[in-house]
């Protein structure tokens, strides 16, 4: 990796960290903000958050697909500008509908940035560097989510608007970093006069369909597991013990990701991805079974969370590698945008968990999640066996 590429990559990783800190400082407090500022009831807040998140995901798909037609550096700058503008606008308006729309803009912009960031890495990094850098980026995201919420807690105690201003300030530095140090994507420069680009390709690629469905199921299991666990513990015990469990599970998850993500991710390659993704699935299942038997033992909750997190550590770079392998060179951002639809699985997890916990024995929740992650693994294998674009199967 030459000096220019190293600077560009470092600038993008730092930008990813700062934007995630800003998002982490605000997203957990949106319910408090809507309650205090607009006196919304709990159910209305739930509807508002769901609408905003759904709009953000849907529009980010379209904008992410369009990113393949433009310079990715400029596209990331536009996404960050929209991200910062949304936070500033929320503090200036006095209308709940506008707040929801601006929150949707924030989520859309963040998703677009994350998608184009992956595409930039795919365009410019060597095959041996991609999973290493993506693992580092995933570590940055977890560090951001570790730092952001405590900062937001401190600021919201002073003023309900301060977390939003922090997020806007955090956005200013990435704009500077990207403008100065990030080079234009070599793929865009080489193909902007005659690239072959068609969104219809997304609908015709069976491997992408299998991988997206697999990602949806995997994110349903792992994307909101902390809230899922807290719902479960509140049913079998009480709110106080649920807080203790979450206080154990989240630090264990963050510590495992920060310390192991790079060392595990850098070992992923086309030759061993099937075996490692199978091992990751097994870790998910063992962790979920461990949750069933953890009961009132915080030690068992922590140990089960550690095993569960190993599955997450393997799946994150593995899913990136799978999509990168099947995406045509001119459509990297489009493919990563389609993959991002899988995160809708995490969005519906709290709703489904609530239904399961109120209609079935509590332990059945983790049995269902174990079956879901096994289904995700089966769909992933179907995608691996597909042969897109005349390529050989991945492994």
From Swiss-Prot:
Location(s), subcellular: Cell inner membrane
Magnesium recorded as keyword: no
PANTHER family per record: MFS FAMILY TRANSPORT PROTEIN, SUGAR EFFLUX TRANSPORTER A-RELATED
Purpose: A transporter able to export peptides. When overexpressed, allows cells deleted for multiple peptidases (pepA, pepB, pepD and pepN) to grow in the presence of dipeptides Ala-Gln or Gly-Tyr which otherwise inhibit growth. Cells overexpressing this protein have decreased intracellular levels of Ala-Gln dipeptide, and in a system that produces the Ala-Gln dipeptide overproduction of this protein increases export of the dipeptide.
GO biological process, one term: dipeptide transmembrane transport
NCBIfam families to which the protein is assigned, alphabetical: PRK10054.1
Name by which UniProt lists this protein: Uncharacterized MFS-type transporter YdeE
GO MF annotation: an example: dipeptide transmembrane transporter activity
GO cellular component labels: plasma membrane
Listed transmembrane segments: 12-34, 44-66, 75-94, 99-121, 134-156, 160-182, 208-230, 245-264, 271-293, 298-320, 341-360, 364-381
Disulfide bonds: none
Location (main, coarse): membrane
Gene3D superfamilies from the UniProt entry: MFS general substrate transporter like domains
Pfam name, any one: MFS_1
Membrane topology recorded in Swiss-Prot or TrEMBL: Multi-pass membrane protein
Keywords: Cell inner membrane, Cell membrane, Membrane, Peptide transport, Protein transport, Transmembrane, Transmembrane helix, Transport
Gene from which the chain derives: ydeE
Signal sequence bounds: none
Lineage of the organism: Bacteria, Pseudomonadati, Pseudomonadota, Gammaproteobacteria, Enterobacterales
Natural source organism: Escherichia coli (strain K12)
Key word Glycoprotein present: no
Family stated for the protein in its record: Belongs to the major facilitator superfamily.
């Amino acid at each position: 990796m030459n000096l220019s590429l190293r600077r560009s990559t470092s600038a993008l990783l730092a930008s990813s960290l700062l934007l995630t800190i800003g998002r982490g400082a605000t997203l957990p407090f949106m319910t408090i903000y809507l309650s205090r500022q607009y006196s919304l009831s709990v159910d209305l807040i739930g509807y508002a958050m769901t609408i905003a998140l759904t709009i953000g995901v849907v529009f980010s798909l379209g904008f992410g697909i369009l990113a393949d037609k433009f310079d990715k550096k400029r596209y990331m700058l536009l996404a960050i500008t929209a991200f910062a503008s949304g936070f500033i606008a929320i503090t200036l308006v006095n209308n709940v509908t506008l707040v929801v729309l601006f929150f949707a803009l924030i989520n859309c912009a963040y998703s677009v940035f994350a998608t184009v960031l992956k595409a930039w890495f795919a365009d410019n990094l060597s095959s041996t560097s991609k999973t290493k850098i993506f693992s580092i980026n995933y570590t940055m995201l977890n560090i951001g989510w570790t730092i952001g919420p405590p900062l937001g807690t401190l600021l919201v105690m002073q003023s309900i608007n301060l977390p939003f201003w922090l997020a806007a300030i955090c956005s200013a530095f990435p704009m500077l970093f990207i403008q100065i140090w990030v080079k234009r994507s070599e793929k865009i420069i080489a193909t902007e006069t005659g690239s072959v680009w068609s969104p219809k390709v997304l609908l015709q690629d069976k491997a992408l369909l299998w991988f997206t469905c697999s990602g949806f199921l995997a994110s349903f299991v792992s994307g909101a597991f902390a809230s899922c666990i807290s719902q479960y513990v509140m049913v079998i015990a009480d709110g106080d013990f649920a807080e203790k469990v979450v206080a154990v599970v989240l630090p264990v998850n963050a510590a495992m990701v920060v310390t192991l993500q790079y060392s595990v991710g850098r070992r992923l390659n086309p030759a061993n991805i099937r075996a490692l993704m199978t091992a990751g699935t097994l870790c998910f299942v063992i962790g979920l079974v461990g949750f069933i038997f953890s009961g009132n033992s915080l030690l068992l909750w922590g140990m089960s969370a550690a095993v569960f997190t190993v599955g997450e550590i393997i799946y994150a770079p593995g899913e990136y590698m799978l999509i990168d392998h099947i995406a045509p060179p001119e459509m990297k951002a489009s493919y990563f945008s389609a993959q991002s639809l899988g995160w809708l699985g995490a969005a519906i997890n709290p709703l489904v968990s609530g239904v399961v916990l109120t209609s079935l024995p509590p332990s059945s929740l983790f049995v269902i999640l174990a079956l879901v992650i096994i289904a995700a693994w089966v769909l992933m294998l179907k995608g691996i066996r597909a042969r897109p674009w005349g390529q050989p199967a991945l492994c």
